[in-house]
Amino acid sequence: MPVNPADLDRAQRALAAALDGSGPPVEFAEDGRAILRPEAADPAAGGAEGVVAVVRTSGSTGTPKQTLLTRDALTASAEATAARIGGEGQWLLAVGPHYVAGLAVLSRSIAAGTTPAALEPGPFTAQSFAAAVDRMERGTGFRALSLVPTQLTRLLLPGSSGSSTDGPGPIAGFGGAAVDALRTFDAILVGGASVPRRLRDAAAEAGLRIHLTYGMSETCGGCVYDGVPLDGVTAELVHDPASGVPRLRLAGPMVSPGYFDDPERTHAHFGVGTEADPDARWYLTEDTGTVEGAPGAPGGQRLAVTGRVDDVINTGGMKVSAAAIQRVLESLPGVHAAFAGSVPDLEWGQRVCAAVVPEAEGAFSEAAARASIRDRLGPPAVPKQWLVVDALPLLPNGKTDRQDLLARFTPPL
């Protein structure tokens, strides 16, 4: 979790130096320390020109990568974000700067000429959040914050199963210091994982000004807000011959030049030139979705992410979507959170599996869930193996730890 004030100051100064050219590229450690990475700006060493930061991730699949971010990309991201959310001002750092969401808070603060506040090191709780907001500057105008869904759940719905031990139940009438603190922000960016409808509804009922963001390290963080690409960003669907489903491709000035010292993966995911702009850099994601509208057309584009390429499950010769199964489960009464995936199976090829976090003991009905999935998605989508858990395991960035969950299911039959 975020850093102490002294480390935050050093982190921002290190990134500012990289951005203005007086210092080398940086990578942030989990404790907020700035690690100097001069080789990241050297193409001969596996880097790229103009690189100012490196974001190291392993992702939910466990495959490590080092994403290179350039001065131009971070600047474009900061400017487009300010234009979309309606202003620049002071940010609260609630996500570590070793994640792209935290690094983006620093780069946006540098662009705005402000100093971010930060949570103290330690577990993220409603109390620590409210205390951090109290330390923010008064009367500075625009305030912004970036959270992952797990954090917002702990603030809005602290009694939800598996989310926190801060309170005995949901905040009555959405009161309390943490929710009052959330209301002081002009913009709350929520991304990094899907946001359940229950959480979106709770945020709306509490009167919070949230923006659901979509993006990744390769796009300097969120580049699509509330389903609409930021200025300069375009989206299109590209057929993926391996999976047989279309993949989302994002293009714009905030796209990374690639991965450090990984030319094969860089070639597979990055390129230059789209139908709308022959000079635009693009990134081919691992996500599936829909895109409505054309770049520059009235109303612009709207994008919806429906799942991941590796979420497509081929079971008994039929293709089903793990993301669609998860959405059905999370729409059911008594279900707080859910996960759907697959494991190898000698008979079916891939066996559909599901894990469910119930709202309360005995609140989940497997029979009702089976019937709902069968009615809405068809018999092949009905999970053949179920787990009921107290909480979904999470990676440090708040995303569901897919590998942990899949390892819990029975080995191939």
Describe each PLM feature range.
Residues 6-9, 38-56, 89-90:
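Conserved pre-ATP/AMP-binding loop-to-beta segment of ANL
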Residues 25-26, 71-76, 90-154, 211:
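AMP-binding/adenylate-forming
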Residues 241-273, 320:
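Conserved ATP/PPi-binding loop(s) of AMP-dependent carboxylate-activating enzymes
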Residues 52-79, 86:
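Conserved AMP-binding A3 loop
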Residues 378-400:
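AMP-binding/adenylate-forming catalytic domain of the ANL superfamily
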Residues 159-226, 236:
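Gly/Ser/Thr-rich phosphate-binding loop
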Residues 252, 279-281, 288-381:
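AMP-binding/adenylate-forming catalytic core of the ANL superfamily
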Residues 5-20, 81-82, 100-112:
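Hydrophobic alpha-helical segments in the ANL/AMP-binding
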